[in-house]
Amino acid sequence: MIQTESTLRVADNTGAREIQCIKVIGAGQKQYANVGDVIVGTIKEATPGGVVKRGQVVRAVIVRTKRGIKRPDGSYIRFDENACVIIDENKDPRGTRIFGPVTRELREKKYMKIISLAPEVL
């Protein structure tokens, strides 16, 4: 579960390393974001020469959470870190590579470009 002030690792090659959540994009008074949800965040740590800079406000989709997700068959999938991928207005990733695994739930949310770039889909 990601909420305001949560920090996430960035799982792409845009140059950002860490994002802090400012707002969860969604319906009404939604407080928490899970895998596949879009957040607005500010870049807290970035590498020099990247596409994005420190302090820039960006949108990102969550691809991994520590809390995990319950699947319809009753199994859970959880990760060691909270991670996201920076996206543009058309919900396409701004980077050209994705690092680490992503979940199948992104397919249901129509993030096919992220699924195709990911090295592993769990």
From Swiss-Prot:
GO MF annotation terms: large ribosomal subunit rRNA binding; structural constituent of ribosome
GO BP terms, alphabetized: translation
Ribosomal protein listed as a keyword: yes
Alphabetical keyword list: Ribonucleoprotein, Ribosomal protein, RNA-binding, rRNA-binding
GO CC terms: cytosolic large ribosomal subunit
Subunit structure: Part of the 50S ribosomal subunit. Forms a cluster with proteins L3 and L19. In the 70S ribosome, L14 and L19 interact and together make contacts with the 16S rRNA in bridges B5 and B8.
Function: Binds to 23S rRNA. Forms part of two intersubunit bridges in the 70S ribosome.
HAMAP family found in the cross-reference section: Ribosomal_uL14
Family in the record: Belongs to the universal ribosomal protein uL14 family.
PANTHER family found in the cross-reference section: 50S/60S RIBOSOMAL PROTEIN L14/L23, LARGE RIBOSOMAL SUBUNIT PROTEIN UL14M
Protein name listed in UniProt: Large ribosomal subunit protein uL14
Species the sequence originates in: Natranaerobius thermophilus (strain ATCC BAA-1301 / DSM 18059 / JW/NM-WN-LF)
Gene name tied to this protein: rplN
